[in-house]
Amino acid sequence: MAERTVKPQRRALVNRTTNETKIQISLSLDGGYVTVPESIFKDKKYDDATQVTSSQVISINTGVGFLDHMIHALAKHGGWSLIVECIGDLHIDDHHTTEDVGIALGDAVKEALAYRGVKRFGSGFAPLDEALSRAVVDLSNRPFAVVELGLKREKIGDLSCEMIPHFLESFAQAAHITMHVDCLRGFNDHHRAESAFKALAVAIKESISSNGTNDVPSTKGVLF
């Protein structure tokens, strides 16, 4: 089975449409400029989850503010450029939007990845004040997620706390990665969740970085 080699720009454009959500994602795992062919929004949206620098373009619009904030943190600290647009059935609740964005983002990561010459394994710790989280990732083609955040509140902003681990689980399943994310301590749920996403960003960034070879990091000789 052919394996793709690490290249300067690893990119994906994903469109996902169901009866519940319409999603468009443009991703570059290595930063740089990204755009979408045509926005799904009739009127262009900008919010606090938009950040443009010399090395990254990040614009997250899911309609769920705290979800935007978490994906923004994931992209920023992972070194990605990322545009996420979603129109979802938020008149029902936040479930379909959160789950489907996780699936679409996982699809984008899987499509963008190169599998030769990557480290494959990555780990990261991230503190946010009193909160400390750990994430460990394996680009394994064995989709599995263990997420223990210990959140106590019903919601953070307009995002149900039960949907935060579900987003991460949906992402891992679609990206075909093994992922363990744990919040080790902390009493502020906002801090606990955000430190977890930042730790995951650090872990993924390490796992997809070059190992200095052109080899597939597996005894099987293949990953995906």
From Swiss-Prot:
UniProt pathway annotation: Amino-acid biosynthesis; L-histidine biosynthesis; L-histidine from 5-phospho-alpha-D-ribose 1-diphosphate: step 6/9
Enzymatic class: lyase
Sorted UniProt keywords: Amino-acid biosynthesis, Histidine biosynthesis, Lyase
Coiled coil: none
Catalytic activity: D-erythro-1-(imidazol-4-yl)glycerol 3-phosphate = 3-(imidazol-4-yl)-2-oxopropyl phosphate + H2O
EC number: 4.2.1.19
Intrachain S-S bonds: none
Highest taxon above the source species: Eukaryota
GO biological process, one term: L-histidine biosynthetic process
InterPro entries: IGPD_sf, ImidazoleglycerolP_deHydtase, ImidazoleglycerP_deHydtase_CS, Ribosomal_Su5_D2-typ_SF
GO terms of molecular function: imidazoleglycerol-phosphate dehydratase activity
Pfam families: IGPD (PF00475)
Residues annotated as transmembrane: none
Recorded family membership: Belongs to the imidazoleglycerol-phosphate dehydratase family.
UniProt protein name: Imidazoleglycerol-phosphate dehydratase
Organism: Cyberlindnera jadinii (Torula yeast)
